[in-house]
From Swiss-Prot:
One of its GO terms (biological process) is positive chemotaxis. This is Flagellar motor switch protein FliM. GO terms for cellular component: bacterial-type flagellum basal body; plasma membrane. It is a peripheral membrane protein. The keyword Lipid metabolism does not apply. Gene3D superfamilies: CheC-like (3.40.1550.10), SpoA-like (2.30.330.10). Pfam families: FliM, FliMN_C.
């Protein structure tokens, strides 16, 4: 297309400038953006946009499966957000905290190794909750052999989820080669090799941490032909998608949730709270014959009547809350 404007186009441009619909700075900025396109020779792009998009889809599937798995293990809803970046192996190693939980793994069809790295705050919080603790105040020290052995099994399960997410492109059986806590001792590829870094932001409540998966280019290069939207669409059979959705539905039904029967609530002044003693009676705004509120994960869900069942306190569900706060 020619860069020369017609007289009519010139008149329209001048009219837009006079009316303030278009600013001169915008034209200059647009022209400047067209002239210069930065390129980092130290970090050349090894992957096409299509391959990166497919890689993102693979690991978003992994993120959803990881969210379901962690929600079951930690007994609360865990949100997992996936992001992907391209950088050198040296830059990745420098970004890893010391100490950290670094798992070097491979697959039966891979030529080379990859890295699964978990931040220690997540490592110790998850370990403590699995062992029956509250998961608070994680220490900042290298894990012991016993702690490593327990969490190694958890990472093995997570790597299995990762392999399942890859199965539409390349089925592989993951295996752990080694575990380290100091990134300076981990050298799986040359420092200047390009790697794809998959970062999973793991959060629940006020807690947030990260899991990183580092894929070296040399390991992925033989698979690049399969990393395309076309291949992905051809490999996705409707019955297979439905089968996986059913698996996710079944897995989600096993996630434990907290159910609370709220007998009543009231408001007290700070002085009244400070003056409370053993034996004091606090009046609630609920009559003993009234229905009580039943919360699921802190949100009103049902109404019920308290009572006793087989020698234990219980509550009978009598109605359900609607979106407006009323109940049926």
């Amino acid at each position: 297309m020619s860069d020369v404007l017609s007289q009519e186009e010139i008149n329209q441009l001048i009219e837009a400038l006079m009316k303030g619909e278009l600013k001169e700075e915008d034209l200059l900025k647009e022209e400047e953006e067209k002239k210069v396109k930065p390129y980092d020779f130290k970090r050349p792009s090894k992957f096409s946009k299509e391959q990166l998009r497919t890689f993102q889809m693979i690991h978003e599937n992994f993120g959803r499966a990881l969210s379901t798995y962690l929600s079951g293990r930690l007994r609360t809803f865990v949100d997992v957000e996936i992001s992907i970046d391209q950088l050198t192996y040296e830059e990745f190693i420098r970004s890893v905290m010391i100490p950290s939980f670094i798992v070097i793994f491979t697959g039966d069809v891979f030529e080379g190794s990859a890295i699964f790295e978990m931040r220690l705050d997540l490592f110790y919080t998850m370990l403590d909750i699995i062992m029956g603790g509250p998961g608070e105040n994680p220490p900042n020290r290298p894990p012991t052999e016993i702690e490593t052995s327990i969490m190694r099994k958890e990472v093995t399960n997570m790597l299995t989820l990762l392999a399942q997410a890859w199965s539409d492109f390349q089925y592989f059986i993951p295996s752990i080669e080694n575990v380290e806590t100091n990134p300076q001792f981990v050298q799986i590829v040359p420092p200047n090799e390009i790697v794809l870094l998959v970062t999973a932001s793991v959060s629940w409540g006020e807690f947030t941490s990260f899991i990183n998966v580092c894929w070296p280019f040399s390991l992925l290069e033989p698979l690049l032909e399969k990393l395309s939207d076309r291949f992905w669409m051809m490999g996705r059979k409707p019955e297979k998608v439905e089968e996986r959705m059913e698996e996710l539905r079944k897995a989600s039904q096993k996630i434990p949730v907290t159910v609370q029967a709220v007998i009543g609530e009231t408001e007290l002044r700070l002085k009244e709270i400070l003056d409370l003693e053993v034996g004091d009676v606090i009046r609630l705004g609920t009559h003993y014959k009234d229905e009580i509120r039943i919360d699921v994960e802190g949100r009103p869900k049902f109404r019920g009547i308290p009572g006793v069942f087989k020698g234990k306190y219980a509550v009978k569900v009598t109605g359900e809350f609607t979106n407006g706060g009323e109940y049926e």
